[in-house]
Amino acid sequence: MGRGKIVIQKIDDSTSRQVTFSKRRKGLIKKAKELAILCDAEVCLIIFSNTDKLYDFASSSVKSTIERFNTAKMEEQELMNPASEVKFWQREAETLRQELHSLQENYRQLTGVELNGLSVKELQNIESQLEMSLRGIRMKREQILTNEIKELTRKRNLVHHENLELSRKVQRIHQENVELYKKAYGTSNTNGLGHHELVDAVYESHAQVRLQLSQPEQSHYKTSSNS
């Protein structure tokens, strides 16, 4: 049979109460540790026994977690109060104005517009910042040039490959024409012919074939005229 439901109420027997407190306290601290590790949560646990003995656990530190808790509660209360909310956004606006002023002043110093009153150390810091910026610009420029060179090399190799492929096709077509010429006129006619002479012979043979094919039409035309 299953265990009966335990009634949650104060344990009267002091010995049983102490044993239960010890077991439940250890289990609670174990669960707090697991929650902090598994969920990357900031956990703080504070326990006082009925004898005023302190037990605590914190994933970071009890003090920092309590300070964070107090700050969060204070901000929450301020946001719930309209007047406090206005003050909050006023502080935010003032902070942003100060940051903007600092950025503008830094920009003027980096561009050399506002250098009066700066010490030697401050000028050296500005010089170091400019040198770092120049190094970054040079590195970016070199990277862009390297990428462009790689792309041009890739295109050159592609064109070279296409030229080789076209050259192979031309040679293959020439060989086919030579084979056709040999079949049509025999191998004896090709002996002793150079490359250009053989090409001329192939094209000349093609012209003769076209001429021979057109002669019957001319003969028929002449016969019709005589009749």
Curated annotation (Swiss-Prot):
<dbReference type="Pfam" id="PF00319">
    <property type="entry name" value="SRF-TF"/>
</dbReference>
<dbReference type="GO" id="GO:0045944">
    <property type="term" value="P:positive regulation of transcription by RNA polymerase II"/>
</dbReference>
<keyword id="KW-0804">Transcription</keyword>
<dbReference type="GO" id="GO:0000977">
    <property type="term" value="F:RNA polymerase II transcription regulatory region sequence-specific DNA binding"/>
</dbReference>
<dbReference type="GO" id="GO:0046983">
    <property type="term" value="F:protein dimerization activity"/>
</dbReference>
<dbReference type="InterPro" id="IPR033896">
    <property type="entry name" value="MEF2-like_N"/>
</dbReference>
<dbReference type="InterPro" id="IPR002100">
    <property type="entry name" value="TF_MADSbox"/>
</dbReference>
<feature type="domain" description="MADS-box">
    <location>
        <begin position="3"/>
        <end position="57"/>
    </location>
</feature>
<dbReference type="InterPro" id="IPR002487">
    <property type="entry name" value="TF_Kbox"/>
</dbReference>
<dbReference type="InterPro" id="IPR036879">
    <property type="entry name" value="TF_MADSbox_sf"/>
</dbReference>
<dbReference type="Pfam" id="PF01486">
    <property type="entry name" value="K-box"/>
</dbReference>
<dbReference type="GO" id="GO:0003700">
    <property type="term" value="F:DNA-binding transcription factor activity"/>
</dbReference>
<dbReference type="GO" id="GO:0005634">
    <property type="term" value="C:nucleus"/>
</dbReference>
<dbReference type="GO" id="GO:0048578">
    <property type="term" value="P:positive regulation of long-day photoperiodism, flowering"/>
</dbReference>
<keyword id="KW-0238">DNA-binding</keyword>
<comment type="function">
    <text>Probable transcription factor.</text>
</comment>
<keyword id="KW-0805">Transcription regulation</keyword>
<dbReference type="InterPro" id="IPR050142">
    <property type="entry name" value="MADS-box/MEF2_TF"/>
</dbReference>
<protein>
    <recommendedName>
        <fullName>Agamous-like MADS-box protein AGL17</fullName>
    </recommendedName>
</protein>
<feature type="domain" description="K-box">
    <location>
        <begin position="86"/>
        <end position="176"/>
    </location>
</feature>
<keyword id="KW-0539">Nucleus</keyword>
